[in-house]
Every structure is written in C-alpha cells, then in structure tokens.
Amino acid sequence: MMRTLLVFLLLAILAAVLIGNIQVEACKVLTDCNHSNAHSRCIKGRCVLMPG
C-alpha cells in the first residue's frame, strides 16, 4: 500500500514539473515577445509588458 502511494506521488510530481516546463517558455531575444503584445520586452528570459 505504501509503495503504491509513493509511486503515485512521484508520478504526480513528475507530471506537474513537465506541465510547468511546457507552460513557461523562456524568451531568448527581443522579438520572441512580439506575438503577445507589441510593448513586451524580453528581460531575463521572461516577456515583460513595458509601459508606453
């Protein structure tokens, strides 16, 4: 019983990590953020909305 629970927990953690990695797409260059908003800029791997 305990072993089954441990395996299930490990699989759930693995699935959560994989889903998180798919959702977080790091930008590498300035133009990677143009699809979401014209005023977005790539800063430290994330698309950040810039004022103006």
From Swiss-Prot:
Q: What else is known?
A: Does not show effect on voltage-gated calcium channels, potassium channels, and tetrodotoxin-sensitive sodium channels. Does not show activity on Nav1.7/SCN9A, and shows very weak activity on cation channel TRPA1.
Family, similarity comment:
Belongs to the annelide toxin family.
Protein name (database record)? Peptide HSTX-X
Q: What is its main location?
A: secreted
Q: Does the keyword Disulfide bond apply?
A: yes
Tell me the function of this protein. Leech salivary gland peptide with unknown function.
Q: In which tissues is it expressed?
A: Expressed in salivary glands. Highly expressed in the head, body and tail with a 2-3-fold higher expression in the head.
* Pro-peptide positions on chain: 22-25
Which positions make up the signal peptide? Answer: 1-21
Gene Ontology cellular-component terms for this entry are: extracellular region
Modified-residue entries (Proline amide), positions: 51
The compartments listed are: Secreted
State whether keyword Transferase applies. Answer: no
Which pairs of Cys residues are joined through disulfide bonds in the record? 27-42, 33-47
Highest lineage ranks of the organism? Eukaryota, Metazoa, Spiralia, Lophotrochozoa, Annelida
Domain of life, per UniProt, equals Eukaryota
